[in-house]
Amino acid sequence: MTRDLTVGSPIKLIISFALPMIMGNLFQQMYNVVDTIVVGQFVGKNALASVSSAYTIMVFITSIIIGLCMGAAILWAQLFGAGDYKQLKRALTTSGIFIIIVTFCMMLLSLVGIEYILRFMNIPYELYADTKMYLQIIFCGLIFTFLYNIVASLLRALGDSKTPLYFLVLSAMLNIILDILFVLGLEWGVKGVAVATFIAQGIAAILCLLYAYKHYEILHITKKEFIFDISLFKVIAKYSILTSIQQSIMNFGILLVQGLVNSFGTVAMAAFGAAVKIEGFAYMPVQDFGNAFATYVAQNKGAQKASRIQEGVKCVVKLSSFFCVIISAVVFIGAKELMLIFISSSEYEVLNIGIEYLRVIAPFYVLIGFLFMFYGLYRGLGTMKLSIILTIISLGTRVILAYVLARIEYIGLIGIWWAVPIGWALADGVGYKFYSQIKKRTLNL
């Protein structure tokens, strides 16, 4: 069912639209989290480190595809908000052709260049074989990543954030069952969790496409309507490539930090891998408030309702602040209990490093909440360059400070942790300055 976000209470619309996205993101995170828990508890520390490092690489590669879909969805939402369904169909076919070509290129390049990727990441020798095998299987499933995300992005652009959730729930449940079967039953180890993820993602992608085609007339595209529109492609390429650059810069920065952590050994890798999973869950609600806000802004821009965009900014700031205060307290106080989900209590060093990371980062979640709001605002307005600038400031600060501080003998790992909130704070300051400038010309949005 489509939803018009240009009428009604902004705060109610954003919450109701974001909740299914939060649940969907929760279950999407479950793919690797379940893999991490299973290998951490039943295979061992080295397997946990392998899957954690592989996950960082996987997220970087898939973020390019996801970014392309998210960028194209901004144009789809604007056309839907304007009621221009003929152009919307043209935009869909043009986007689909463009993104699937990029996906196949990414799949081939990733498989061919996997050795270079692993060397760049400083993967220790004892983890090399498992990490390589995990990634090879995951890279073969990039076509499913494309398929699911382009359909899910379309449905969200039309105001339907529930349907993608249902298929992610199904897929996550299947992933858990297959993890248990392949790892505990067949004793396949790291290979087992990779195969489970591949199968589960494939089923979710295919079923989501079939359901959407059956229930959404906009997907019933005839041969005559199947057009690659050059003029639309220029707009789509601008939105998609800029959003993809933002996503890939974000994850490339994390990739560089992961490489730095890897240089501290397997214990640090395992701790960082588990702590980052917890962190991902912690700020997931505010991330999806930002994603929901992007669709809200795009539809209202298409409908030329600038005042509602300003109302939406105030709503998202309040929502993000409320959630971040609660989540920060939970993570800070429960850091040890959260780490024990991923690693055995006998791994004292791993536990202590992970707890330290979480207690440094947790008090500052409100900063990342505001940053996601700015990302959503500028993406929805179609000013993706501003989002890229904020991402470069945030991640650039984090990476540079991490490499500088980590090399100081009496600081070490904790310097990597403190670089994170400093990067968030600087990006928020610049983001607010951009917003102040845009507010002055709001009526021209």
PLM regions and their residue ranges:
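Short alpha-helical transmembrane segments in multi-pass integral membrane proteins
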Residues: 1-18, 76-141, 187-241, 297-364, ...
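Transmembrane helical elements of multi-pass membrane transporters/channels
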Residues: 16-35, 137, 148, 171, ...
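Residue-level signal for short hydrophobic patches within transmembrane helices
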Residues: 7, 11-30, 34, 57, ...
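Generic alpha-helical transmembrane segments of integral inner-membrane proteins
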Residues: 22, 26, 30, 34, ...
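Helix-terminus/linker motif at the lipid-water interface of multi-pass membrane proteins
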Residues: 26, 30-48, 118-125, 181-188, ...
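Short runs within selected transmembrane alpha-helices of multi-pass transporters and secretion channels
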Residues: 69, 138-156, 164-172, 193-206, ...
